[in-house]
């Protein structure tokens, strides 16, 4: 499997009263931003079309490991992400249950929005809404959740990227 060179870039973000930092991982498939604060990683951002600013400092070790894991995942490797570095403080209780269900979907498998909703105790529409606000795409693999008719459904990185990720994991969509 070919490995790509990745560059880490620090971006400072002012969010309300909280100062956060973001490192970006540049990858041929998509650029990723990992945002963290005092309590851990607060968001993973798919950076398609986002203007980037550079600062050549090195990320903390936990962030570097997460970025390396994301790079390996995008290179097609099977990765067991360390979820302990993620800060779920911005998630509702229901969204956290949905994300817990989705984090257990193995590579090469999918669940429907209805199946996720049943396991999380909600409706398919509320599960889809919770996933549309997934703060940790790729690490919490919401791309593995599809519609009941076998179509991809939506994805914050775009349906084209969702299909590429699923194909990379060996999933072919029936409704396509």
From Swiss-Prot:
CDD domains: ATase. It comes from the Archaea. The active site is at 142 (nucleophile). It holds the Pfam family DNA_binding_1. GO terms for molecular function: methylated-DNA-[protein]-cysteine S-methyltransferase activity. Keywords: Cytoplasm, DNA damage, DNA repair, Methyltransferase, Transferase. Transmembrane segments: none annotated. It is found in: Cytoplasm. The keyword Methyltransferase applies. GO terms for cellular component: cytoplasm. Its EC number is 2.1.1.63. NCBIfam families: ogt (TIGR00589). This enzyme catalyzes only one turnover and therefore is not strictly catalytic. According to one definition, an enzyme is a biocatalyst that acts repeatedly and over many reaction cycles. This is Methylated-DNA--protein-cysteine methyltransferase. The lineage of its organism: Archaea, Methanobacteriati, Methanobacteriota, Methanomada group, Methanobacteria. The gene is ogt.
């Amino acid at each position: 499997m070919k490995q790509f060179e990745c560059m880490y870039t620090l971006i400072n973000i002012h969010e309300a009263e909280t100062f956060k930092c973001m490192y970006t991982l540049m990858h041929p498939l998509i650029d990723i931003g990992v945002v963290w604060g005092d309590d851990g990683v607060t968001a993973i951002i798919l950076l398609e079309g986002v203007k980037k600013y550079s600062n050549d400092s090195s990320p903390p070790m936990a962030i570097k490991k997460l970025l390396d894991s994301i790079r390996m995942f995008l290179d097609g490797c099977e990765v067991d992400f360390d979820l302990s570095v993620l800060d779920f403080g911005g998630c509702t209780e229901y969204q956290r249950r949905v994300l817990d269900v989705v984090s257990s979907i193995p590579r090469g498998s999918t669940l429907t929005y209805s199946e996720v909703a049943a396991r999380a105790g909600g409706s398919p529409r509320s599960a889809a809404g919770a996933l549309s606000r997934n703060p940790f795409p790729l690490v919490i693999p919401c791309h593995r959740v599809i519609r009941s008719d076998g179509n991809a459904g939506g994805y914050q990185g775009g349906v084209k990227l969702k299909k590429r990720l699923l194909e990379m994991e060996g999933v072919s969509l029936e409704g396509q």
